[in-house]
Structure formats: structure tokens, C-alpha cells
């Protein structure tokens, strides 16, 4: 693993090599390869630490400066330069930092995962202490803490778990102008605000009386003339700059005698009311607010935005406000108020166009990627350290000071730890499958510190904006309260050094499309006419049509002559994200269902046997390889030794390289992460060749599900309302089986009464329970375990009980000091079972494993369980078509085709028209065609655009997004499918076949749509959800059972369920449910007693909730007395308390079944 976290991913991906030959049925040939899908994460972190990727980009920019300028300094250099120098209050001493360096990492990624450590490298920086009084300089290399590193998959390993830092979408610093309608009049109000990356806002606004005012640091409004005077403008300068604008000149004439000091005092009085105002205080206030780099920072992007919007020519490295910025902002706002279309730039012969800003436009929102987020956190940690350094400068002996004694690295370490461990943007990685992980790393979140909150975000900010085209996916977003606030980067987009998202276009010159690729931000794109990727072209790349459909600013569409087209999209999949681009026939689906399809692919569980889809989109290989779960050859060579966990390649340069294969590792979501070697000893491999498949990949392609033979038909009502019927074959053949691994952990600690101990010697436990424990008391690998079985024997010291005289005598004679212990063993939780596949023991004594304070040993046990498909599991297609399995039919009962082939799965045809996801039907048809193979005879009219004239049975095809095969072509291909041995084609040109009832052998009355659909098994498994309880915990307040599986709670019997039993008159069942099974405290204790002793169930008592009603009525001054037949007061609490006290010895154990009782 390389230090910079960009190992083989960076090098091996010149070209993604895939073993499956997938035939494309698209018409467009993409001129641009899909970029590395992890670049967003890898490039940003590489800039932070000054790695090789950033250096290469910087060198390239220096040779050919085009596009956004690349940062001249690395993120670490920037932040240490900002804080230097740290001076004491008298200015006699200063401390400078320079040359931050990351040394080699202590542990590899694999070791960090196993040992529960953080993958990091020590950060060193050169610190120089200078004493101005003596001229003495002391230099030292100082350790600044361990700096977490990014792995080559774009993740961080923090305390042994993989985490992802999500990029944040925030409002860019800059200057913004807006028009808001006035509620009580027909006039519009105009405002302009300068928003920095760090510091106070400066706002200007025109009120309903056409007067221009200013707000300093969002305080009270005051006339703009005061501010102009306060920044030192004379009467003549004000007349020259603003003479043409009445809203300012009127103010100026009124305050002609106003001095600068008076203006400063007035501003101070408005900003700090109640404090003593003086000209000097006002000058210091404005200086600190807007003209000091320590307090105000526009950032590179803010300066770029201000210069571009206002047309000013300020040095791009100047991060504070200048007088020309302020004058240009006021002139722009005054011109906007007067309705001008452009405004002249002062002291220059150019002018800038005037427009208000759409804050949701991606030209005004930027990405804060991982490098910048970590840099901001480091900056906060250094600021805390700076205060410590200043304090130590004043307290320590000047002669003895060296840099090391001044610096305390704890604030820096704490700041980074806090960010990676608890920040809203540092998230537990979604490792459900490779697509889930890849999408997580490409996610863009508007939430988090400095962003929006989901409660206050309106519809506008969540909505799709025309500027999202090619930058942010309009489809993929969550369905819940975060809809629109969390998005995903589009396939081809990239983030420039300012943080704006760019998307590529092909340049069009004189109506001819060239292969020159140009990346543009949303603001640059607004100035051009852009044609779509599917526009027909001649062989010489000129447009077929004289007039071409183009996009303009604001998403407006118009038809223009071909020679007026400036650019053209590079690909049909350019506007969508990776997950959405994996949906074939996306163009035939409703957007709501496409959203569900995108999200559900991320929930697909890795199956026991992977199979790539018959019908794909061509994106499968990019996803599988860029996600990093496929093992790839870094250099060409010959495969040497091959074993299950290591592949050795003898490279052409003579070196031997070992590739480690991951075997049965638990992912964050409890799935089985397993890699399978696909090469053999002696094979020739090139750079980028797949050596081993990962979970959900098949020969280097993403494979989330299985190709199943599907029939669209109702069957005895079992597939009513999205329910699904499947064949018993899928269970028997493990077609949809998956392996799940659970992790169970136990630690021994030092307690007040002594140390806990891992042992086989447990009190009051029979040999049957410990037969699978080894001599240490830890379960053996390979043991089959079920609920309640002991995994690790552990005893904890118990407090001494009062000893009898005899025991005291025996202890005195035999000097026996053994205290009593209680059994605190680790057991298998309810509802879990499986085979122990691994055990890890960490010992604090070794020194290698840092376990934390007070922990002596830690044992981790991994249990694997194979889950076959069963009723209640959730299946889905890629088109948002989802359902729950309602029945598993014997294969002999399933409908079958004329040749005897039974279908695998029966779907309800009514699930298609209302959902408007017809892509699933076209996928089914094309799936059948590619399974059978085809050969196009002659040159029929429908086949003129199909490049693949012949395909063998079981071949893989791709129908790219927005460039897919048409309905007419599918109909034609049905007639070209290879016939069976009888010379017949089972499925007609309409995609339908005669099916026969498996029970009777009779044909169904109508032909039925049959074909192959790619079906995913989702993570919503019934085994994780099903739950039952006999006894368990109760709520302290209501005395009713707790809710939820996690709390081992009961099932809620709600209002509607009560109505149902009332309707049937089931009085006794209802009484039992509302009393002894719920909150009749006395009754339930008696019932438990009766069950244990075998007595009849006693009659129920009074539930607690009834007593609450009585108290409620008494509080309303209605005296209620509840009496039984024997005139006894039933509602008294005395009896309840008495019985509860007497029966307090009742067992507190959770009983699993009546047999246990």
C-alpha cells in the first residue's frame, strides 16, 4: 500500500480490462472513457498531503495553463503557512512552521482492520523559534501527531472500521445580488452581499424609498454614505464613482460636511450599541472585519467569483476586501436597481452584464471535498494550539525555550479524532456491495457543519436545477426527509480546484463535431448552445439535420442552425450517476421508479454464486474495477504460484509481486466479503487484467443479482399487490443464497473487586454447554452454534457475602482467598445461529495491541450463516420493481414452456402500467433474445443501426442509457433468434409464449410475456425482522412490554387489532391481551407461576392503564370507586405492591420456549 493512498487504483486504470465480451447495442461511440470514479476522493486527499497526483497536475498546469488554476501549495503547507508566525504579545519571540512531512505508516491497512487501530502516518513539521532580543534561532523537527491516511479505495480506517468522508455541497464565497418582491407595494427590493469563506458579511440593500443602505456584520442598517466616508473616500471620489446614481448622490448632498471620524463613530455606535464610540474604535472595527487576513478570508474561490462578477482586476492572491471591491459592488447594485443591462467598471474601458443570482445554481454552489474538510479541522486544531503556545511563551524561561517545549499536539490530535469519529460528514462506510461503497464515496451532501439543516431546507434548494445537467444526478437521491439534500456526482463530472463541478463537452466547429474535449463549469456553460449526445451525425462528424436541438442558459431548449452549435454532450449517460447508469432502458422508466431502482441496487446482498446480467448498460466493468473490490494486475507478467489467499506474478521486469486475496471477511453491513482467484498458474496477464473477482463481481463486471426466467401473469392471487412467487429450484440450487457474518466481541477489564477472567471453569454450567470451548474458554473454529450458546467463557468477581463461622475457620486454615464469581460469558444472541469461522484474541500484555484503559484482553468471534431465499424476503429488479416473496412453489407446480422449461419467478402484470416502468418489460424481452442468441439474415430495414449481426446463446449485451435498442429492433431480433432443436421459436415476435399450468398440464388461455430479468436479493431479510417473545423487559412507566426486536420487546396490539377481535366477539382472547399479556402486573406474575407449576391460568386482574384512567378522572374532581362482586375496592394499589414485594424473587431470565419453562 502506498503512503499516499493511491496504490494500484491510480496506476492500473489506464484501460479497464474485462474478461466478459459484452456486445453494445448503442448507436453512439463515446469519445471519452469514463474517468476513475474515485478521483473526487483520491485527488482531494492527495492535494492535502502534497502527493504525486497533485504534483503531476500542477506541473501539467504550469506547462499549459487552461481551466481553473491548480493550487500552488499543498493543503498542509497552506495551513502551516497561515498560522506562522506565532508571536508573543510584546513581539519579542516568534515561532514559525514549515515543511510538513508524513513519514511511513506504522501498520498496513490490513493490520489496522484486524487490530482495531487507525491507519495513519506520523506528521512531522520543522519548527523555528526566534528570539528577537538576542537574535537567537532554534530549529527542531517536531512531531505533530498521527495523521489518518486514505487507503487506495478512498476510505479511512478509524479504530479498525472503514469510514468515508462525504463531500459537502455549500454556498460558494463571493458576491451575490438578489431581487425580492415587496409585500405591501409593487416595488421590488434589491440587495447585494459579499459573503466570505471566513469572517463578517457585508450587505448593501435598496429600500422601498430608493435609499441605498449598508449592514455591517448583519447588524442595523445605516446609510451607505457613512460607510464610504469611513473607508476614506473624499467628496470628489464619491461624486466620480456614484454621480450617475441618484440613490447615493442624494445621501451625499445631505451629508456633505460629514467627516471620516464622525462616520467611523456612527458606524461603531450602530454595530456595538451601548459601548463608548470613538473614531479609533470604529477604524479598528472595520479593519478587523474586512481588511485583516486573520479575521476575513474570501478564499481563492471567493476572490475569483468577486473578480468575475464585478469585473474588477484585483490580485487573485489577495483574500481581503479592497476599496475597489466595495465601490464596484455598490455601483452594480445601484445599476441593478435602475434596471440597467450592464454597468461600466470604474477606471477601465470594459463593462459587465447585470443579472441577479440564483443561489441554487451550481455556479454558486461548490464542493468541499475531503481534503478541504480535513484541512479546516486541522486549522481549528492549530488555532487551539496557538493559544497554548502564546501562553507558554509568557510563562517559560526564555533561555530554556525550544520549539518542542512550546508545542502541545493534543489539540490537533483531538480535532482530527473528533472529525473522523463524530462529524456528520465522516460516515460508517456502506459496504453492502461494491456499488454501495462507490456511491457512498461519490455522494454530495448539503447537510453538515456550515451547510443546511433538513428542517429548514425548502423546496427550491432540494429541486432539480438545470445547472445539475452532467454534474449532479437528477435521479439518485434518498426518498425520505433528505430528498434533494443528498445527491450523487454524475458519471463524467469532476471537481476543479475552486470546488466547482465541471462536465465535459465535445467542441463543435462550423457544424462539425470534433474530438476535442473541454470541461466547463455551470457558469461557463450558460454562454453556449449545446447539442445532445444522441444528435445524428454523418461519418465525417457533421450534423445530419440542418437545424439541431440545443440547450441554452436556464435549461431553455430551442432549435438552431447547425453552424450555431458550440458544443455537444460526450455521452448519453453524462447526466446521470453511476447507479442510475446501470439501469438498462432507463429512458422508458418513470423518474420516481428510476430513483427507487438506483437506491435498491445499493441494497443488493452479495450472493453465493455471482452472475453478470444478460442485459447491462456497459458501465458494469467501470464500477467493479473502480470500486476496488476486484484484484487487478499492476504490471504485465506471468502468473506463478496461486493459492486461495495469495497470487504471485512474475513481472516482465523480473520482479515477483504477491497479491493478497481477501477471504471471508465481514463487511460493515455483516455481509461476506470474499475474493475468488480467476487466473491459473502460467497464465499471461497484462496491466489491468482481473486476477480475482470480489463480492458481487463476475469476471470483472458488477454482478448484483441473478438472471431468472420470469413470467408476467397472476397465479391464484399469490402475487397480488407486488407479491412474488418463486420456484423451489431457487432454494434447492442456492441461486439466491447469501452468506452473512456476525461479529461478537467481549473484553475483560479490571474491576474494583479484581480482574475479570476468560476461562472454561464457569460456575453452575454443565459440560454440555462448554463442550465446544477450548482450554482457554474460547469457542473452537468450526463449531455450530445457536441462540444462547456460550462463545467465550468469562467470569467477573462478585462482592464477598457474609461468611458463616465454619467457612471463616476453613478459610483461616487453608488460607483460601478465592472470591465468588458470576458468569458473564459471551453468548449467541436471540435469533442468531451459524458456524464459527474465526476467533481473534488480543492481549494487552503483548504491547502490540493497544486495547484502551483498563482492558486486559479482547476476544472477537465471527459466526457465518448461509441464508437461503425464503418467504418474506424482498426481491427487486433494476427498475424500481420490488416485492416480497409470498409463496415458494414446488417446481412441478410452476408454469412451464412448450419445451418443458419451468419459469423461475412469477410477477404480477398489474405492477407495470401504473408504475410506468416499462424498462422491465423491454429488459425481459432482450434478456430472452440474448439468452437464446441471434443471427440477422440479409439486411432488413429495422437492423440498419444494429452493429452486432450475430450473437451466440448466453451472450451478454449492453443497452446504454439514453442510447438503447428500440422497440422495433427488439421485435426484429425476436424473428432472428436461434430456433430450438425442433426448429421452433418458443417466444413470438410480441415477446409472448404459450405457458402450461404445472398442476394440470393445460395451457393457459392467453400467451404470456416470458423472458430473463436480472433480479436482486435485497438486504431486507425476513430472518433479521422476525421476532417473538414469551417473557422479557417491561417499561418502568407504563408497565407494558418494550417495543422492537432490539429491546426484545413484544408485538403491539393496537386499536385496529382490538376492533378486529371485537368484531369476532373474541372476549377472552381480548381480555388476555389487554391484561396479563400487557400491564396487569399482579396477573402476569401469577400466570408465570401457574405455567411453571402446571396449574390452570388464573383470571386477569386490573391493568395499570385502567388505574391511570381512574387517576385522570379523579384529577377532574370525579370520584371513581371500582368495586368487585364482593364489594371489595379493586383499584387500591396496596395489594399490588404487597404481591410484587412478595414475588420479587421471580426469575428475571428471558425464557425462549415453554420447554425451557
Swiss-Prot record:
One of its GO terms (molecular function) is DNA binding. It is an enzyme of class 2 (transferase). Its EC number is 2.7.7.6. One of its GO terms (cellular component) is DNA-directed RNA polymerase complex. InterPro entries: DNA-dir_RNA_pol_bsu_ext_1_sf, DNA-dir_RNA_pol_bsu_external_1, DNA-dir_RNA_pol_su2, DNA-dir_RNAP_su2_dom, DNA-dir_RNAP_su2_hyb_sf, RNA_pol_bsu_bac, RNA_pol_bsu_CS, RNA_pol_bsu_protrusion. It comes from the Bacteria. One of its GO terms (biological process) is DNA-templated transcription. It holds the Pfam family RNA_pol_Rpb2_45. Keywords: DNA-directed RNA polymerase, Nucleotidyltransferase, Transcription, Transferase. It catalyses: RNA(n) + a ribonucleoside 5'-triphosphate = RNA(n+1) + diphosphate. PROSITE patterns: RNA_POL_BETA (PS01166). PANTHER family: DNA-DIRECTED RNA POLYMERASE I SUBUNIT 2 (PTHR20856). DNA-dependent RNA polymerase catalyzes the transcription of DNA into RNA using the four ribonucleoside triphosphates as substrates. Belongs to the RNA polymerase beta chain family. The RNAP catalytic core consists of 2 alpha, 1 beta, 1 beta' and 1 omega subunit. When a sigma factor is associated with the core the holoenzyme is formed, which can initiate transcription. This is DNA-directed RNA polymerase subunit beta. It comes from Tropheryma whipplei (strain Twist). The gene is rpoB.
Amino acid at each position: 500500500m502506498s503512503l499516499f493512498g493511491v496504490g494500484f487504483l491510480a496506476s492500473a486504470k489506464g484501460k479497464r480490462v474485462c474478461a466478459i465480451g459484452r456486445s453494445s447495442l448503442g448507436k453512439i461511440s463515446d469519445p471519452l472513457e469514463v474517468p476513475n470514479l474515485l478521483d473526487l476522493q483520491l485527488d482531494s486527499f492527495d492535494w492535502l498531503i502534497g502527493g504525486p497526483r497533485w504534483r503531476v497536475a500542477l506541473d501539467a498546469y504550469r506547462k499549459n495553463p487552461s481551466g481553473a488554476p491548480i493550487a500552488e501549495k499543498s493543503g498542509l503547507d497552506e495551513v502551516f503557512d497561515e498560522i506562522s508566525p506565532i508571536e508573543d504579545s510584546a513581539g519579542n519571540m516568534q515561532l514559525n512552521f514549515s515543511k510538513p512531512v508524513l513519514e511511513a505508516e506504522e501498520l498496513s491497512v490490513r493490520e489496522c482492520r484486524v487490530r482495531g487501530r487507525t491507519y495513519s502516518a506520523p506528521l512531522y513539521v520543522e519548527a523555528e523559534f526566534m528570539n528577537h532580543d538576542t537574535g537567537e534561532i532554534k530549529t527542531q523537527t517536531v512531531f505533530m501527531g498521527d495523521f489518518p491516511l486514505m487507503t487506495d479505495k478512498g476510505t479511512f480506517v478509524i479504530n479498525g472500521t472503514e469510514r468515508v468522508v462525504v463531500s459537502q455541497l455549500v454556498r460558494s464565497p463571493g458576491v451575490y445580488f438578489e431581487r425580492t418582491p415587496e409585500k405591501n407595494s409593487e416595488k421590488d427590493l434589491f440587495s447585494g452581499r459579499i459573503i466570505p469563506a471566513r469572517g463578517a458579511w457585508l450587505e448593501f440593500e435598496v429600500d422601498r424609498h430608493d435609499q441605498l443602505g449598508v449592514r455591517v456584520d448583519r447588524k442595523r442598517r445605516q446609510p451607505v454614505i457613512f460607510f464610504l466616508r469611513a473607508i476614506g473616500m473624499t467628496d470628489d471620489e464619491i461624486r466620480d464613482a456614484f454621480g450617475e446614481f441618484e440613490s447615493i448622490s442624494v445621501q451625499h448632498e445631505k451629508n456633505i460636511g460629514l467627516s471620516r471620524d464622525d462616520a467611523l463613530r456612527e458606524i461603531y455606535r450602530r454595530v456595538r450599541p451601548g459601548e463608548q464610540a470613538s473614531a479609533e474604535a470604529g477604524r479598528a472595527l472595520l479593519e478587523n472585519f474586512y481588511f485583516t487576513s486573520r479575521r476575513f478570508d474570501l478564499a481563492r474561490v471567493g476572490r475569483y467569483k468577486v473578480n468575475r462578477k464585478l469585473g474588477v482586476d484585483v490580485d487573485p492572491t489577495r483574500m481581503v476586501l479592497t476599496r475597489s471591491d466595495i465601490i464596484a459592488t455598490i455601483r452594480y447594485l445601484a445599476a441593478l436597481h435602475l434596471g440597467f443591462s450592464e454597468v461600466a467598471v470604474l477606471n477601465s474601458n470594459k463593462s459587465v452584464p447585470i443579472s441577479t443570482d440564483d443561489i441554487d445554481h451550481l455556479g454558486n454552489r461548490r464542493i468541499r471535498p475531503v481534503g478541504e474538510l480535513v484541512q479546516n479541522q486541522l486549522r481549528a486544531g492549530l488555532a487551539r494550539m496557538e493559544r497554548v503556545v502564546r501562553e507558554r511563551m509568557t510563562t517559560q524561561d526564555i533561555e530554556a525555550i525550544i520549539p518542542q517545549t512550546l508545542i502541545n499536539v493534543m489539540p490537533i490530535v483531538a480535532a482530527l479524532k473528533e472529525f473522523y469519529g463524530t462529524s456528520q460528514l465522516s460516515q460508517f462506510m456502506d459496504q453492502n456491495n461494491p456499488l454501495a461503497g462507490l456511491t457512498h464515496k461519490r455522494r454530495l451532501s448539503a447537510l453538515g457543519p456550515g451547510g443546511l439543516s433538513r428542517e429548514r431546507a425548502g423546496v427550491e434548494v432540494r429541486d432539480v436545477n438545470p445547472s445539475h445537467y452532467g454534474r449532479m444526478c437528477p435521479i439518485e437521491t434518498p426518498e425520505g426527509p433528505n430528498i434533494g439534500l443528498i445527491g450523487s456526482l454524475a458519471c463524467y463530472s469532476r471537481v476543479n480546484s475552486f470546488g466547482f463541478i465541471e462536465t465535459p463537452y465535445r467542441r463543435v466547429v462550423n457544424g462539425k463535431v470534433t474530438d476535442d474535449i473541454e470541461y466547463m463549469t455551470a457558469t461557463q456553460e450558460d454562454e453556449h448552445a449545446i447539442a445532445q449526445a444522441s444528435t445524428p451525425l454523418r461519418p465525417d462528424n457533421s450534423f445530419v439535420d440542418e437545424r439541431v436541438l440545443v440547450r441554452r442558459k436556464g435549461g431553455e431548449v430551442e432549435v438552431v442552425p447547425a453552424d450555431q452549435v458550440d458544443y455537444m454532450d460526450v455521452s448519453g449517460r453524462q447526466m446521470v450517476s453511476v447507479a442510475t447508469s446501470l439501469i438498462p432502458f432507463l429512458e422508458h422508466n418513470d423518474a420516481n421508479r428510476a430513483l427507487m431502482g438506483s437506491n435498491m441496487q445499493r441494497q443488493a446482498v452479495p450472493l453465493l454464486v455471482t452472475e453478470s446480467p444478460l442485459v447491462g448498460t456497459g458501465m458494469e466493468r467501470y464500477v467493479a474495477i473502480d470500486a476496488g473490490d476486484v484484484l487487478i494486475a499492476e504490471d504485465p507478467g506471468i502468473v506463478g504460484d496461486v493459492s486461495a489467499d495469495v497470487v504471485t506474478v512474475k513481472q516482465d521486469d523480473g520482479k515477483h509481486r504477491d497479491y493478497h486475496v481477501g477471504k471471508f471477511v465481514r463487511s460493515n453491513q455483516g455481509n461476506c466479503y470474499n475474493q475468488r482467484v480467476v487466473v491459473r498458474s502460467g497464465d499471461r496477464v497484462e496491466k489491468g487484467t482481473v486476477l480475482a473477482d470480489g463480492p458481487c463481481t463476475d469476471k470483472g463486471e458488477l454482478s448484483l443479482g441473478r438472471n431468472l426466467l420470469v413470467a408476467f401473469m397472476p397465479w391464484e392471487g399469490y402475487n397480488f399487490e407486488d407479491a412474488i412467487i418463486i420456484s423451489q429450484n431457487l432454494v434447492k440450487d442456492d441461486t439466491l443464497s447469501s452468506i452473512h457474518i456476525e461479529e461478537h466481541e467481549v473484553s475483560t477489564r479490571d474491576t474494583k473487586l479484581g480482574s475479570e477472567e476468560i476461562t472454561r471453569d464457569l460456575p453452575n454450567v454443565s459440560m454440555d454447554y462448554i463442550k465446544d470451548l477450548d482450554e482457554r474458554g474460547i469457542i473452537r473454529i468450526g463449531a455450530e452454534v445457536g441462540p444462547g450458546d456460550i462463545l467465550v467463557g468469562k467470569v467477573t468477581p462478585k462482592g464477598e457475602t457474609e461468611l458463616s463461622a465454619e467457612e471463616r475457620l476453613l478459610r483461616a486454615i487453608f488460607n483460601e482467598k478465592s472470591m465468588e464469581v458470576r458468569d458473564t460469558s459471551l453468548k449467541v444472541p436471540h435469533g442468531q445461529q451459524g458456524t464459527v469461522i474465526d476467533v481473534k484474541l488480543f492481549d494487552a500484555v503483548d504491547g502490540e495491541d493497544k486495547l484502551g484503559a483498563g482492558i486486559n484482553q479482547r476476544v472477537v468471534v465471527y459466526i457465518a450463516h448461509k441464508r437461503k431465499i425464503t418467504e418474506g424476503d424482498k426481491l427487486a429488479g433494476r427498475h424500481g420493481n420490488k416485492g416480497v416473496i409470498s409463496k415458494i412453489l414446488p417446481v412441478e407446480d410452476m408454469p412451464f414452456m412448450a419445451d418443458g422449461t419451468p419459469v423461475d419467478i412469477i410477477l404480477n402484470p398489474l405492477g407495470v402500467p401504473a408504475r410506468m416502468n416499462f424498462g422491465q418489460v423491454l429488459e425481459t424481452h432482450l434478456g430472452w433474445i440474448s439468452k437464446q442468441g441471434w443471427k440477422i439474415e440479409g439486411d432488413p430495414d429495422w437492423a440498419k443501426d444494429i452493429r452486432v449481426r450475430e450473437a451466440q446463446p448466453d451472450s451478454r449485451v449492453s443497452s446504454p442509457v439514453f442510447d438503447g435498442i428500440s422497440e422495433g429492433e427488439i421485435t426484429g431480433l425476436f424473428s432472428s433468434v436461434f430456433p430450438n432443436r425442433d426448429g421452433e421459436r418458443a417466444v413470438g415476435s410480441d415477446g409472448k409464449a404459450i405457458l402450461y399450468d404445472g398442476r394440470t398440464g393445460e395451457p393457459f388461455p392467453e400467451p404470456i410475456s416470458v423472458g430473463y430479468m436480472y433480479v436482486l436479493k435485497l438486504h431486507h431479510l425476513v430472518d433479521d425482522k422476525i421476532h417473538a417473545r414469551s417473557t422479557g423487559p417491561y417499561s418502568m412507566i407504563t408497565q407494558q412490554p418494550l417495543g422492537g426486536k432490539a429491546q426484545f420487546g413484544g408485538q403491539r396490539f393496537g386499536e385496529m387489532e382490538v376492533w378486529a377481535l371485537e368484531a369476532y366477539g373474541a372476549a377472552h382472547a381480548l381480555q388476555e391481551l389487554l391484561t396479563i399479556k400487557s400491564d396487569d402486573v399482579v396477573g402476569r406474575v401469577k400466570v408465570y407461576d401457574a405455567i411453571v407449576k402446571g396449574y390452570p391460568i388464573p383470571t386477569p386482574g386490573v391493568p395499570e392503564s385502567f388505574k391511570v384512567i381512574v387517576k385522570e378522572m379523579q384529577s377532574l374532581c370525579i370520584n371513581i370507586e371500582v368495586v368487585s362482586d364482593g364489594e371489595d375496592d379493586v383499584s387500591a394499589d396496596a395489594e399490588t405492591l404487597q404481591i410484587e414485594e412478595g414475588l420479587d424473587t421471580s426469575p428475571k431470565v428471558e425464557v425462549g420456549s415453554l420447554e425451557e419453562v
